[in-house]
Structures are given as C-alpha cells and as structure tokens.
C-alpha cells in the first residue's frame, strides 16, 4: 500500500499543478467568473492538494500492520486513495452544476476523514503489543 499512496500522492500533486494552470490559461485565472463558480473551482483545487498530500504522508510513513490491523488499515487506505480522484472529478464537474452541490468533493472529504480515523484506530498506543504482533507477522518483503 505504501507505494500506491506515494504514487497517488505524486500524481495528485502534479494534477494540482495542472488544474492551477487550467484555471489560469483556460479561465483567465477565474476573472469575471461569478463568485459561486469561482469558489467551487478554488475549493476543489485545494481539496485535490489536500488529498494528495495526505497520500504522500501515508506513503512516506506507513508501516506494516499485523493482527486485526492488517484488515482495518487497507479499508482506511482505500478511502484515502479515492480522495484525489473524487476531488479531481469535483474540480471538473461541480463548478458547472446549479447551486452549491458537492456530489464529489463532499464524499472525498468525508472519505478521507473516515480513512484517517481507521488509520488512527490501527495506531496502537501499547508498544509491547505492537512489537509482539509485528514479530509474529510473516515477513512482507522488506516493506517497512
């Protein structure tokens, strides 16, 4: 999962830079656009950066899990991995919807929150239990 988080994070940061250029070149840096549409463009742009940076952080610091954590952590990772993709969809779709509906950005933000809460639950405060579980876990190919 670690490399997947890193890859999604890097691609997401590149996507963030590309969407910034898109707003600048295609929409004249959002000049003359109504306030609601400009708000939707900019917030989705920042959600893309947010989701990408969370994935980068997980990719850099995620450690192997053992025991029940081996099953809970991937669920959290899937939710976090979906965040940049949903934010990117929100960037291109939501500004053109009527009103301030957020059918992509809202699930992206809540999914990232839920995923990180699952990662938090997996982070044991009892170090001895964690060490015992990791020693009992089979070698996972050097992923640390």
Report the location of each language-model feature.
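Polytopic transmembrane helical bundles with strong interfacial aromatic enrichment
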Residues: 1-45, 49-144
């Amino acid at each position: 999962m670690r490399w997947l988080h890193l890859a999604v994070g890097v691609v997401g940061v590149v996507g963030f830079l590309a969407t910034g250029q898109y707003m600048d070149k295609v929409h004249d840096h959002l000049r003359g656009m109504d306030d609601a549409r400009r708000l939707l463009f900019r917030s989705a742009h920042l959600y893309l950066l947010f989701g990408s940076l969370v994935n980068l952080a997980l990719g850099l610091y995620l450690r192997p899990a053992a025991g029940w954590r081996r099953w809970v952590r991937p669920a959290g990772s899937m939710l976090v991995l979906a965040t940049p993709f949903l934010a990117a969809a929100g960037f291109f779709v939501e500004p053109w919807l009527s009103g301030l509906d957020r059918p992509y950005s809202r699930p992206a933000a809540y999914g990232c929150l839920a995923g990180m809460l699952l990662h938090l639950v997996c982070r044991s405060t009892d170090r001895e239990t964690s060490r015992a579980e990791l020693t009992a876990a089979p070698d996972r190919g050097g992923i640390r």
